[in-house]
């Protein structure tokens, strides 16, 4: 399933996106290889948080739709000087391992360069305990920078985990 239609997220998409993001990150323990359920509890995002994200002037949320117009993936881009931060990236667990994630990430990188031609790199932050996800991003050209930050304490995750920075040259 690599035939996706990409577009900018709209406010009307918020309920469907909140369901998709929370399903991808916090549910589907047996099915999804991207779930954070055993490491992080609670919702990944709320409707209010997503609405606030969509209103940021330096931020874009792209969605990938199947041929039936169902949103099956999303990815967020936050532009800062010559860098774009990639986040809020997920695919519906039902379409994982079908190259959807790869297509979405490639499209997002190309979109970012088209929107801001002077970009030099993309950066993302990944849970240090997610070795399979880190390996996935390494296969996509991202490298660990050595920079780490503690996972937000207010997230009340219980287990001390870190976010590691990964970066990819876009030029």
PLM regions with names:
Residues 10, 78, 87, 92, ...:
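Residue-level recognition of the GNAT/N-acetyltransferase active site
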Residues 118-171:
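C-terminal "cap" of GNAT-fold acetyltransferases
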Residues 43-63:
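A short helix-loop-beta-strand connector motif used in the catalytic cores of GNAT acetyltransferases and
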Residues 1-15, 168-171:
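Conserved N-terminal entry element of GNAT/NAT acetyltransferase domains
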Residues 70, 92-106, 128-135, 139:
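Conserved glycine-rich acetyl-CoA-binding loop
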Residues 22-50:
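Conserved GNAT-fold acetyl-CoA-binding loop/helix
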Residues 103-121:
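Conserved acyl-CoA
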């Amino acid at each position: 399933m690599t035939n996706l239609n990409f577009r900018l997220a709209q406010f009307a998409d918020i309920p469907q996106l909140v369901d998709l993001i929370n399903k991808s990150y916090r549910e589907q323990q047996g099915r999804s290889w991207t779930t954070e359920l055993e490491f992080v509890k609670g919702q990944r995002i709320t409707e209010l948080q997503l609405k606030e994200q969509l209103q940021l002037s330096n931020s874009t949320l792209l969605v990938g739709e199947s041929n039936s117009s169902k949103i099956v993936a999303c990815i967020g881009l936050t532009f800062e000087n010559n860098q774009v931060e990639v986040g809020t990236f997920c695919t519906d667990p039902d379409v994982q391992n079908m190259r959807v994630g790869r297509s979405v990430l490639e499209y997002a990188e190309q979109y970012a360069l088209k929107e801001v031609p002077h970009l030099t790199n993309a950066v993302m932050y990944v849970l240090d305990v997610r070795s399979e996800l880190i390996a996935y991003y390494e296969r996509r050209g991202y490298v660990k920078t050595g920079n780490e930050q503690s996972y937000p304490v207010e997230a009340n995750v219980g287990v001390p985990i870190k976010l590691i920075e990964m970066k990819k040259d876009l030029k």
